[in-house]
């Protein structure tokens, strides 16, 4: 099958430096891969997509999500709480309220939000598991992704020991056994994991948080099994100052040192957040090639802080973007996340500016992140972290994962540089098309077979059901 995208106004590649922008204006796709980029002549019987006045980006790669939280947006008990109190008030409070129907609907809503922003690959850190569960949340995540044509990286969360904020949970939601957790990871790898470059299904070892979800000896065994199986490792780390306090109190070391002691650093490992890091931790992450899923909107919503991507990237840490769960980020789409990352990295550097009489050397932080940087983090960076070696950039020979944005909303009127529109202007740009492995999964801003109005009504009913079950 041959497909040609013609007349693009601008193309961002996901590559660094001068290669970040491509002249185009045409892209030919054959057998799911990019075959040519330049001024091309259509071939006989070649399907064409006219991208006139459109901007093309690599399809976004979201490296951290909790899809089940898509039915927990704006939940009042946790709306103005910081992380630990929010965990008790919202996600832990509602975990037992989910059944197969509400879980499936939440996953579908989250995936649709991402699709409509130009995201085709999603790492879902799913931690809704308990013994004798009457439905298989892993199967639901994969099947919903398949129905929408998306690439799913299932990060198999869970815990084999509890923490203080979980002590009041129903018995059914208490920690799993270590043997049960490990056996299920092996089951999932055997059934779903596909290591091929064009794969649409991957599995990751992902205990919910390394400091609290399992004893150190078990963490080592998890890392060992993951590497034997050829899968990656993921977890939360250093989201707030509480991680520093907990690691010192429990282990007499920093959180990153704890990870190093238990074989949880390396280029096959990435952590969500990494907001509160000491300089020596940044250096250690960089030396080992351990990655970050930067979640600026969730970190802002919970008041956790802003990760120092400048220092992390300079140290050698691979950088990617994640939307986190919608219970702490009501704008859980990749365009919103990219816009926030662009602004907040600049604001973070600007907060460090000092007057010259006090030794300051710069006025502000506008050079901290370019739109091209953010596109690279959200595409090539994500693909690198997830081990998708043939995805993430627009280059000949790469998988054709790309988003064609139609900049026809008033927010884009007056732009001098259309290429930056999908990131710089915020909001959601309509999609001319979204392709994964060269196959359109969104066309003319519509997802085939999806009834958004019915989904809206289902969501309203599901929220009421969850509130009743959680008695809030």
Language-model regions, residue ranges each:
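Active-site gating loops and adjacent loop-to-helix segments of metal-dependent hydrolytic enzymes
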Residues: 71-103, 161-178, 241-268, 288-291, ...
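Active-site microenvironment of metallo-dependent hydrolases
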Residues: 1-25, 30, 40, 372-472
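Glycine-enriched alpha-helix->loop->beta-strand junction motifs that scaffold or abut catalytic
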Residues: 149, 227-232, 264-267, 284-293, ...
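Divalent metal-coordination and catalytic microenvironments
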Residues: 8, 27, 32, 53, ...
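Alpha-helical scaffold segments that flank or form the walls of functional sites
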Residues: 74-125, 130-151, 183-197, 460-471
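His/Asp/Glu-enriched, well-ordered alpha-helical/loop segment
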Residues: 261-268, 310-407
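Metal-coordinating catalytic core of metallo-dependent amide/deamination hydrolases
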Residues: 132-275, 280
